[in-house]
Design a protein with these regions (language model features):
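Juxtamembrane/interfacial segments around transmembrane helices
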Residues: 93-100, 121-128, 157, 189-190
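Selected transmembrane alpha-helices and immediately adjacent juxtamembrane segments
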Residues: 94-119
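Short loop/beta submotifs within extracellular cysteine-rich repeat domains
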Residues: 17-21, 84-86, 115-120, 130, ...
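Short hydrophobic "helix-edge" motifs at membrane interfaces and signal-peptide entry regions
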Residues: 7-9, 103-107, 152
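Hydrophobic/aromatic residues within the transmembrane alpha-helices of Major Facilitator Superfamily
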Residues: 12, 16, 46-47, 81, ...
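Membrane helix-loop-helix hairpins that form the core translocation module of multi-pass transporters
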Residues: 32-101, 149-172, 176-179
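Juxtamembrane boundary at the C-terminal end of a transmembrane helix
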Residues: 179-190
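Juxtamembrane transmembrane-helix termini in multi-pass membrane transport proteins
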Residues: 1-61, 121-142, 149
Length: 190
C-alpha cells in the first residue's frame, strides 16, 4: 500500500500544471465531451505508464542497489528542476477528425506523455518498487486524480489555481524524494 501511495502522490505533484493538464483543459473546452475525454485519458495513461514501468523495471534489474539509488535520487532532483519550467499549451485548437473525442484524447495524451516528467517518474518508481501492477495503478490513479477534476471543472478551476505555487510545491516534493533516496531513506527501500 505504501508503494501505491508514493506512486500516486509523486504523479499528482508532477502533473499539477503540466502540459497534459493543459491538454485536458483544451480538449474539454473544444470538444465538450467529458466522459469520452476522461476514458481516453485513462486508456492513454494506462498504456503509457505500463510502457514506462516495464522499461523502469528492466533498467532496475540491471543496476546494483547503490547505482540504482544514486540514479533514482539524481532523477528526482532533475524532475524537481524540470517541474519549475512552465509548460506552454498549444495555441491552436486540436485537429478534429473522425476518431471522435475518445480516440483523439487517447492519441493526444499518449503522445503528450512520451518523455514527460510523469512518464519518467513512472519509470523511476518501477525501477525502485519492481511491482508493475502497483506502479501502473498508482501512477494512473495519480494522473486521474488531477485530470478528472480538470475535465469536470474545466476553466473555473484553472483560473483560480496559483500555478507558480503548485510548481514550487511539486519541485519541493521531488527534491525531498531525491534527497531521501540519496540518503537511503527506508520507505523508498534503500
Amino acid at each position: 500500500m505504501e508503494a501505491f501511495l508514493i506512486c500516486t502522490a509523486t504523479i499528482v505533484l508532477g502533473e499539477l500544471g503540466d502540459r497534459t493538464q493543459l491538454l485536458a483543459l483544451i480538449l474539454t473546452t473544444q470538444l465538450r465531451r467529458p466522459l469520452p475525454i476522461i476514458l481516453g485519458i485513462l486508456v492513454a495513461t494506462l498504456a503509457n505508464h505500463a510502457l514506462a514501468a516495464l522499461l523502469g523495471q528492466w533498467a532496475g534489474s540491471l543496476l546494483s542497489p547503490r547505482v540504482l539509488r544514486w540514479t533514482l535520487g539524481v532523477s528526482f532532483l532533475l524532475l524537481a528542476a524540470w517541474v519549475l519550467v512552465p509548460d506552454k499549451a498549444d495555441s491552436g485548437a486540436p485537429a478534429r477528425s473522425g476518431y471522435g473525442a475518445f480516440m483523439l484524447t487517447v492519441t493526444a495524451f499518449f503522445l503528450a506523455e512520451m518523455g514527460d516528467k510523469t512518464q519518467i517518474a513512472a519509470m523511476a518508481l518501477a525501477a525502485r518498487f519492481r511491482s508493475l501492477a502497483v506502479v501502473i495503478l498508482g501512477t494512473t490513479c495519480g494522473m486521474m486524480l488531477v485530470e478528472v477534476p480538470t475535465v469536470l471543472l474545466a476553466g473555473r478551476v484553472m483560473r483560480t489555481l496559483p500555478l507558480r505555487w503548485i510548481r514550487l510545491a511539486a519541485a519541493l516534493a521531488y527534491s525531498v524524494l531525491g534527497v531521501l533516496t540519496l540518503l537511503g531513506f527506508a520507505p523508498l527501500g534503500f
